[in-house]
Amino acid sequence: MKKTALFAAVAAMLVGCGSQPDKAEQESAFDKYNSVVYELNVRQATPEGTFAAAEEYLPVLKSMGVDIVWLMPIHPIGAYGRKGTLGSYYSISDYEAVNPEFGDLAAFDHFVDRAHELGLKVILDWVANHTSRDAKWWSEGHADWYVLDEQTGVPIVQYDWTDIAKLNYDNADMREAMTSAMLFWIERGVDGFRCDVAFEVPIDFWQQAFARVKEINPDVYLLAEGEKTFLHD
């Protein structure tokens, strides 16, 4: 209940602090370069922590002037080396599945459909740099899809991210699997991606993957985490 009250209070403050767009403005063509993006943590947004519960707040977000709902990673979280009891959203075990804590794919689809009915776009937080250390790809025997420590033969750890395994972008099969996973979500109606640590992934991968994504959705919304100039290409 406290989270619900906090959400309502923040929404009320934001609505009160800014003028509401009139009908003509709301019906004007979408401008991706001047859009309002709202980051949504499914687990924390509601007491239930589910897609279905978060869906109930979509009209509130619309009334706040939000254009795009950016979902923090929605995928299953790895168990091996998990940080804390809940784990990090950015330690993904399966790119083509949803975290069962949030619901199933049908619930996710319903969330996206409702957002679209309200004129909202939905983008996913996409973690292309690494997976969890017990990810589906690793369990399936694709060791060559990872950057391995020469002495131990296990995936390297970057920074203090001890729960992740760095992906090997010199491997064409891994690149194809990553692109295929992105297409999976675009075909389900997702409107784009916020690309986590985009600067750690080769620019030619982004260019190749997005060329294929745009074959399905030419107006895909892309947001990169990083200040490197090559990310603007």
List the predicted regions and their residue ranges.
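Short, glycine/acidic-enriched loop or turn micro-motifs at the edges of active sites
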Residues: 128, 199, 228
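Substrate-binding/active-site clefts of carbohydrate-active enzymes
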Residues: 20-67, 73-188, 208-217, 221
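Short catalytic-loop micro-motif centered on adjacent basic/acidic residues
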Residues: 123, 192-198
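Noncatalytic carbohydrate-binding groove/subsite architecture in carbohydrate-active enzymes
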Residues: 211, 226-233
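Surface-exposed, flexible loop/turn segments at secondary-structure boundaries
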Residues: 77-79, 203, 228-230
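C-terminal motif of bacterial Sec signal peptides marking the signal peptidase cleavage site
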Residues: 14-16
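Sec-dependent signal peptide recognition
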Residues: 2-8
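An alpha-helix initiation/capping motif
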Residues: 199-207
